[in-house]
């Protein structure tokens, strides 16, 4: 299947819509986002995808949006993604919660990160049940999030 990828965040959301339109125009039937960490951002991505489908090729089948989610269970991971991976935005509330948990120990840090990630997964699934769960070969975390 012709799938494409797109950033999950941009300072100017219209650039994301233009990129989606270009991918749809070239035949993408599905667009997978970089990991999403904010429900409001997810809602915006759905709106941008809808607009891109309408403006690009209304005669074609619509390209479906698939949210990427990468569970974060460590403060260092959240900081790295936020600072060094373009197109991904980890909310400050997540970073702060993980910072506090990290000070309490590794187990607490994992627990807080897992709970944030699980809640996000459940919220995204309720909003739009097309999700790509990325776990970097951590199959247990995938199983735990899906259960």
Question: Where are these predicted regions, by residue range?
Answer:
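Alpha-helix-loop-beta-strand connector modules within alpha/beta enzyme cores
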Residues: 1-4, 45-69, 144-147
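Glycine/proline-rich, positively charged
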Residues: 1-14, 124-125
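Active-site pocket-lining/capping segments in soluble small-molecule metabolic enzymes
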Residues: 5-10, 62-120, 137
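Short, acidic/polar
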Residues: 12-24, 113-123
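Active-site-adjacent beta->alpha loops and helix N-cap segments on the catalytic face
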Residues: 13-15, 35-53, 138-145
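Conserved, mostly hydrophobic/aromatic
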Residues: 23, 27, 67, 131
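Catalytic beta/alpha-barrel core
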Residues: 29-39, 111-112, 132-135
């Amino acid at each position: 299947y012709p799938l494409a990828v797109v950033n999950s965040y941009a300072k100017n959301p219209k650039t994301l819509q233009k990129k989606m339109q270009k991918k749809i125009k070239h035949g993408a039937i599905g667009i997978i986002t970089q990991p999403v960490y904010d429900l409001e951002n997810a809602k915006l991505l759905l709106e941008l995808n809808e607009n891109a489908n309408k403006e690009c090729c209304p005669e074609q089948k619509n390209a479906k949006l698939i949210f990427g989610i990468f569970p974060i269970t460590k403060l260092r991971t959240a900081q790295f993604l936020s600072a060094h991976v373009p197109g991904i935005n980890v909310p400050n509330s997540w970073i702060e919660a993980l910072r506090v948990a990290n000070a309490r120990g590794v187990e607490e840090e994992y627990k807080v990160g897992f709970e944030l990630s699980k809640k996000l997964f459940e919220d995204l699934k309720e909003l739009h049940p097309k999700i790509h769960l990325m776990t970097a070969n951590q199959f247990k975390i995938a199983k735990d999030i899906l259960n």
